[in-house]
């Protein structure tokens, strides 16, 4: 059986399309992303977004290490716990997650949509 080169065209350079492009490229598949916007900054991209544990895991699987590191370092982590503070924000009570080791990959994160898009754009070479 002949082994043919596989090339995928992705229509749409939003977060989903760019994540797919990075995952395919990481798997050794040739990718081209087609986007209607002239540049990454041609229109407003919104604010910060929440990425849950499944999203963080998916991004870790799709991104090469040199892109995962900036994602992890620029995104804010959500702690698993509960705090009570005064009106001056002095902590009165802090109940943190007890037991087990926290997973550094599968965790809730908050990241700027613009920053995430720039990280994802750095991968496919588009």
Question: Which residues does each predicted region cover?
Answer:
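Short glycine- and Lys/Arg-enriched binding-loop motifs that mark or flank ligand-binding interfaces
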Residues: 8-12, 42, 51
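Generic structural signal for small/hydrophobic residues in well-ordered secondary structure
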Residues: 19-21, 35, 59, 120
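Gly/Ser/Thr-rich helix-start
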Residues: 15-18, 47, 56
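Conserved N-terminal helical subregion
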Residues: 2-8, 52-126
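Glycine-rich FAD pyrophosphate-binding loop
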Residues: 25-47
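Short glycine-/acidic-enriched loop or helix-start segments at secondary-structure transitions
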Residues: 20, 43, 94
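N-terminal Rossmann-like FAD-binding beta1-loop-alpha1 element of flavoenzymes
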Residues: 3-33
């Amino acid at each position: 059986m002949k082994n043919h080169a596989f090339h995928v065209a992705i229509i749409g350079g939003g977060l989903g399309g760019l994540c797919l492009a990075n995952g395919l490229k990481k798997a050794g598949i040739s990718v081209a992303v087609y986007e209607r916007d002239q540049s990454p900054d041609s229109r407003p991209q919104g604010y910060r977004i929440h990425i849950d544990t499944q999203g963080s895991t998916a991004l870790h699987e799709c991104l090469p290490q040199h892109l995962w590191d900036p994602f992890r370092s620029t995104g804010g982590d959500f702690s698993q716990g509960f705090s009570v503070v005064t009106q001056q924000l002095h902590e009165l009570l802090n109940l943190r997650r007890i037991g087990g080791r926290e997973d550094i990959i599968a965790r809730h994160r908050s990241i700027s949509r613009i920053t995430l898009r720039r990280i994802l754009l750095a991968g496919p070479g588009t």
